[in-house]
Amino acid sequence: MPRARKGALVQCDPSIRALILQIDSGTHDIIWEELDETHLLVDPAKVSYIKEKLNWFLSKNIYNPSEEEENP
């Protein structure tokens, strides 16, 4: 018997998809289905967690010259 469950469709570019896969690699409870290179079906309760972790990853990878001046 098929099961139906409500999910959230995430559309993103392949680089963001790779980050989401990395976030999910520890627990394997975020991504329900990898649909293609730009679409993921995820647990709707985890969407805000995904956004928080993506913001953290992206802020960590942004070059900020003012931080370099503060920490010589």
UniProtKB/Swiss-Prot annotation:
Cellular compartments annotated: Nucleus
Query: Coiled coil where?
Result: none
Q: Name one GO cellular component term.
A: transcription factor TFIIH core complex
Assembly with partners or alone = Component of the 7-subunit TFIIH core complex composed of XPB/SSL2, XPD/RAD3, SSL1, TFB1, TFB2, TFB4 and TFB5, which is active in NER. The core complex associates with the 3-subunit CTD-kinase module TFIIK composed of CCL1, KIN28 and TFB3 to form the 10-subunit holoenzyme (holo-TFIIH) active in transcription.
Q: Look up keyword Transmembrane and say if it applies.
A: no
Q: Which InterPro entries match?
A: TFB5-like_sf, TFIIH_TTDA/Tfb5
Function field: Component of the general transcription and DNA repair factor IIH (TFIIH) core complex, which is involved in general and transcription-coupled nucleotide excision repair (NER) of damaged DNA and, when complexed to TFIIK, in RNA transcription by RNA polymerase II. In NER, TFIIH acts by opening DNA around the lesion to allow the excision of the damaged oligonucleotide and its replacement by a new DNA fragment. In transcription, TFIIH has an essential role in transcription initiation.
Question: Can you tell which superkingdom this protein's organism belongs to?
Answer: Eukaryota
Give the gene symbol. TFB5
Protein keywords = DNA damage, DNA repair, Nucleus, Transcription, Transcription regulation
Q: Which GO terms describe its biological process?
A: nucleotide-excision repair, preincision complex assembly; transcription by RNA polymerase II; transcription initiation at RNA polymerase II promoter
This chain belongs to which protein, by name?
General transcription and DNA repair factor IIH subunit TFB5
Family, according to the entry, reads as follows: Belongs to the TFB5 family.
